[in-house]
Amino acid sequence: AEGALPVEFVLVVSSHAGVRGLVIAAEADIPSQTLLPKDFGSLDAYGRAVFDACRAASAELVVMAGFIKYVPIPPDFENRVVNIHPALIPAFCGHGYYGHRVHQAVLDYGAKVSGCTVHFVDNEYDHGPIILQRVVPVQDDDTADALAARVFEAECIAFPEALALIAQGSVSVEGRRVRVRATEPRP
């Protein structure tokens, strides 16, 4: 189908029961698991369980869409885990910067632009190599809700674009720098 990502979703893992992502997975016949952090003795044990599930499903790439819980990234998944952040990293990011907190911080600081960042996940919050960013202007009369809505629109373009680039083999990582080989002209 037009606009479809050139990927196969093999598993959905959630850190909360009853979330919309699990419903979407069920409707699409994608296997899912709910792994509650409280059921594990430590963050490391929780991370092992998450990535053991990914390995068992033969996942080549892990997408942390809406997964706010910190999870240690094992060496065999280095540069194979991606996330999106609702600001232009390295600004307005790190521990505690998620959801509307990010947008309110952008407004409180008086920033003129915001946006979103798709990045590889490493073992620090919002720190991994940046794959791509989209800029969103901050309007003088913005509220956190209004800015969040515009940033979300940008996220809905950026995340699939980044995933498609990775799936096509167009992305390589050299230290902190992500190189994107030209495929088709990007909008």
Where in this protein do the model-derived segments appear?
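One-carbon transfer enzymes
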Residues: 1-187
